[in-house]
Protein backbone atom coordinates (compact mmCIF):
# COMPACT_ATOMS: atom_id res chain seq x y z
CA UNK A 1 0.00 0.00 0.00
CA UNK A 2 1.39 3.31 -1.07
CA UNK A 3 0.49 6.09 1.41
CA UNK A 4 1.07 8.70 -1.31
CA UNK A 5 -2.00 7.35 -3.10
CA UNK A 6 -4.25 7.34 -0.04
CA UNK A 7 -7.05 9.82 0.48
CA UNK A 8 -6.74 12.97 2.57
CA UNK A 9 -8.31 11.45 5.68
CA UNK A 10 -6.00 8.43 5.66
CA UNK A 11 -2.94 10.60 5.06
CA UNK A 12 -3.83 12.92 7.93
CA UNK A 13 -4.60 9.92 10.15
CA UNK A 14 -1.10 8.61 9.38
CA UNK A 15 0.33 12.00 10.39
CA UNK A 16 -1.63 11.81 13.65
CA UNK A 17 -0.37 8.28 14.35
CA UNK A 18 3.23 9.36 13.72
CA UNK A 19 2.90 12.26 16.18
CA UNK A 20 1.16 10.05 18.75
CA UNK A 21 3.93 7.47 18.42
CA UNK A 22 6.62 10.11 18.90
CA UNK A 23 4.88 11.48 21.98
CA UNK A 24 4.44 7.97 23.38
CA UNK A 25 8.15 7.30 22.90
CA UNK A 26 9.04 10.57 24.63
CA UNK A 27 6.92 9.57 27.61
CA UNK A 28 8.50 6.10 27.61
CA UNK A 29 11.99 7.62 27.64
CA UNK A 30 11.01 9.86 30.53
CA UNK A 31 9.23 7.29 32.68
CA UNK A 32 11.18 4.10 31.96
CA UNK A 33 14.65 5.29 30.95
CA UNK A 34 14.71 8.11 33.49
CA UNK A 35 15.59 11.01 31.18
CA UNK A 36 13.90 14.16 32.45
CA UNK A 37 12.83 16.57 29.69
CA UNK A 38 14.34 20.04 29.62
CA UNK A 39 12.12 23.09 28.93
CA UNK A 40 12.89 23.04 25.20
CA UNK A 41 12.01 19.33 25.10
CA UNK A 42 8.67 20.14 26.71
CA UNK A 43 8.00 22.86 24.12
CA UNK A 44 8.80 20.35 21.36
CA UNK A 45 6.30 17.94 22.90
CA UNK A 46 3.70 20.70 22.89
CA UNK A 47 4.44 21.34 19.20
CA UNK A 48 4.08 17.60 18.41
CA UNK A 49 0.80 17.50 20.39
CA UNK A 50 -0.51 20.54 18.50
CA UNK A 51 0.49 18.96 15.20
CA UNK A 52 -1.18 15.69 16.25
CA UNK A 53 -4.38 17.55 17.10
CA UNK A 54 -4.43 19.29 13.72
CA UNK A 55 -3.80 16.00 11.90
CA UNK A 56 -6.60 14.34 13.90
CA UNK A 57 -9.05 17.19 13.29
CA UNK A 58 -8.26 17.10 9.59
CA UNK A 59 -8.73 13.33 9.46
CA UNK A 60 -12.03 13.45 11.34
CA UNK A 61 -13.38 16.42 9.40
CA UNK A 62 -12.20 15.25 5.99
CA UNK A 63 -13.14 18.40 4.09
CA UNK A 64 -14.52 17.74 0.63
CA UNK A 65 -13.30 20.96 -0.94
CA UNK A 66 -9.71 21.70 -1.88
CA UNK A 67 -9.78 24.90 0.18
CA UNK A 68 -10.49 23.04 3.41
CA UNK A 69 -7.77 20.47 2.74
CA UNK A 70 -5.29 23.22 1.94
CA UNK A 71 -6.22 25.09 5.14
CA UNK A 72 -5.52 21.99 7.24
CA UNK A 73 -2.28 21.42 5.35
CA UNK A 74 -1.10 24.99 5.95
CA UNK A 75 -2.10 24.96 9.64
CA UNK A 76 -0.24 21.68 10.20
CA UNK A 77 2.74 23.07 8.28
CA UNK A 78 2.81 26.14 10.53
CA UNK A 79 2.65 23.98 13.68
CA UNK A 80 5.49 21.85 12.34
CA UNK A 81 7.42 25.01 11.46
CA UNK A 82 7.15 26.25 15.04
CA UNK A 83 8.38 22.86 16.21
CA UNK A 84 11.26 23.03 13.74
CA UNK A 85 12.26 26.42 15.12
CA UNK A 86 12.24 25.15 18.70
CA UNK A 87 14.17 22.01 17.73
CA UNK A 88 16.69 24.11 15.78
CA UNK A 89 17.24 26.31 18.82
CA UNK A 90 17.73 23.19 20.94
CA UNK A 91 20.26 21.74 18.48
CA UNK A 92 22.12 25.08 18.43
CA UNK A 93 22.29 25.07 22.23
CA UNK A 94 23.64 21.51 22.18
CA UNK A 95 26.37 22.09 19.60
CA UNK A 96 27.74 25.25 21.24
CA UNK A 97 31.09 24.79 22.99
CA UNK A 98 30.67 24.01 26.68
CA UNK A 99 32.66 27.10 27.74
CA UNK A 100 30.10 29.34 26.00
CA UNK A 101 27.18 27.82 27.91
CA UNK A 102 25.48 29.92 30.54
CA UNK A 103 24.48 28.44 33.87
CA UNK A 104 21.50 26.15 34.13
CA UNK A 105 18.22 27.96 34.53
CA UNK A 106 15.39 27.12 36.89
CA UNK A 107 12.96 24.30 36.05
CA UNK A 108 9.92 25.03 33.92
CA UNK A 109 7.56 24.51 36.88
CA UNK A 110 9.27 27.34 38.79
CA UNK A 111 9.21 29.63 35.76
CA UNK A 112 5.50 29.03 35.17
CA UNK A 113 4.72 29.87 38.82
CA UNK A 114 6.71 33.12 38.84
CA UNK A 115 6.22 34.51 35.31
CA UNK A 116 3.52 35.01 32.73
CA UNK A 117 3.27 32.62 29.76
CA UNK A 118 5.00 34.92 27.28
CA UNK A 119 7.85 35.64 29.71
CA UNK A 120 8.29 31.89 30.29
CA UNK A 121 8.42 31.28 26.54
CA UNK A 122 10.98 34.06 26.05
CA UNK A 123 13.10 32.91 29.01
CA UNK A 124 13.17 29.30 27.86
CA UNK A 125 14.14 30.23 24.30
CA UNK A 126 16.89 32.63 25.40
CA UNK A 127 18.32 30.57 28.25
CA UNK A 128 19.87 27.15 28.06
CA UNK A 129 18.74 25.37 31.21
CA UNK A 130 19.78 21.73 31.00
CA UNK A 131 19.12 21.75 27.27
CA UNK A 132 22.82 21.65 26.37
CA UNK A 133 23.23 18.14 27.76
CA UNK A 134 23.11 15.27 25.28
CA UNK A 135 21.89 12.21 27.17
CA UNK A 136 20.52 10.14 24.28
CA UNK A 137 21.70 9.38 20.75
CA UNK A 138 20.48 7.18 17.94
CA UNK A 139 22.51 6.79 14.74
CA UNK A 140 24.69 9.67 15.93
CA UNK A 141 21.82 12.16 16.25
CA UNK A 142 20.53 13.57 19.53
CA UNK A 143 16.83 13.63 20.37
CA UNK A 144 16.36 17.30 19.29
CA UNK A 145 18.03 16.47 15.97
CA UNK A 146 15.61 13.59 15.47
CA UNK A 147 12.75 15.89 16.44
CA UNK A 148 13.85 18.32 13.76
CA UNK A 149 13.98 15.50 11.18
CA UNK A 150 10.44 14.47 12.14
CA UNK A 151 9.14 18.04 12.10
CA UNK A 152 10.54 18.53 8.58
CA UNK A 153 9.05 15.25 7.39
CA UNK A 154 5.65 15.93 8.94
CA UNK A 155 5.61 19.49 7.57
CA UNK A 156 6.23 18.18 4.06
CA UNK A 157 3.66 15.42 4.58
CA UNK A 158 1.04 17.98 5.66
CA UNK A 159 1.68 20.12 2.59
CA UNK A 160 1.59 17.08 0.29
CA UNK A 161 -1.67 15.80 1.78
CA UNK A 162 -3.27 19.24 1.77
CA UNK A 163 -2.23 20.30 -1.72
CA UNK A 164 -2.36 16.98 -3.58
CA UNK A 165 -4.62 17.22 -6.62
CA UNK A 166 -7.52 14.88 -6.18
CA UNK A 167 -9.74 14.17 -9.13
CA UNK A 168 -13.52 13.95 -8.97
CA UNK A 169 -14.87 11.24 -6.69
CA UNK A 170 -15.80 8.04 -8.45
CA UNK A 171 -18.52 5.77 -7.18
CA UNK A 172 -16.89 2.64 -8.60
Curated annotation (Swiss-Prot):
The UniProt record lists the keyword Nucleotidyltransferase: no
Gene Ontology MF terms: electron transfer activity; protein-disulfide reductase activity
Membrane topology according to the record: Multi-pass membrane protein
UniProt keywords, alphabetically: Cell inner membrane, Cell membrane, Chaperone, Disulfide bond, Electron transport, Membrane, Oxidoreductase, Redox-active center, Transmembrane, Transmembrane helix, Transport
Compartments (UniProt record): Cell inner membrane
A GO CC term assigned to this protein in UniProt: plasma membrane
Xref: Pfam families: DsbB
Disulfide bonds: 38-41, 104-131
Cytoplasmic side, ranges: 1-11, 64-70, 165-172
Transmembrane segments: 12-28, 47-63, 71-88, 146-164
Periplasmic side: 29-46, 89-145
UniProt cross-references to InterPro entries, sorted A to Z: DiS_bond_form_DsbB/BdbC, Disulphide_bond_form_DsbB, DsbB, DsbB-like_sf
GO terms (BP aspect): protein folding
Keyword Nucleotidyltransferase applies: no
Function: Required for disulfide bond formation in some periplasmic proteins. Acts by oxidizing the DsbA protein.
HAMAP family: DsbB (MF_00286)
Family that this chain belongs to: Belongs to the DsbB family.
Alphabetical list of PANTHER family matching this protein: DISULFIDE BOND FORMATION PROTEIN B
Name this polypeptide is given: Disulfide bond formation protein B
Organism of this sequence: Xanthomonas campestris pv. campestris (strain ATCC 33913 / DSM 3586 / NCPPB 528 / LMG 568 / P 25)
Amino acid sequence: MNPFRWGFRAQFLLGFLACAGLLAYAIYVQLHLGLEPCPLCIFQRIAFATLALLFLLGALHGPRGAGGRKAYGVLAFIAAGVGMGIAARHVWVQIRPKDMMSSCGPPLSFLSETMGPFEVFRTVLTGTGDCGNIDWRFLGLSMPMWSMVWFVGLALWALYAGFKHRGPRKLF
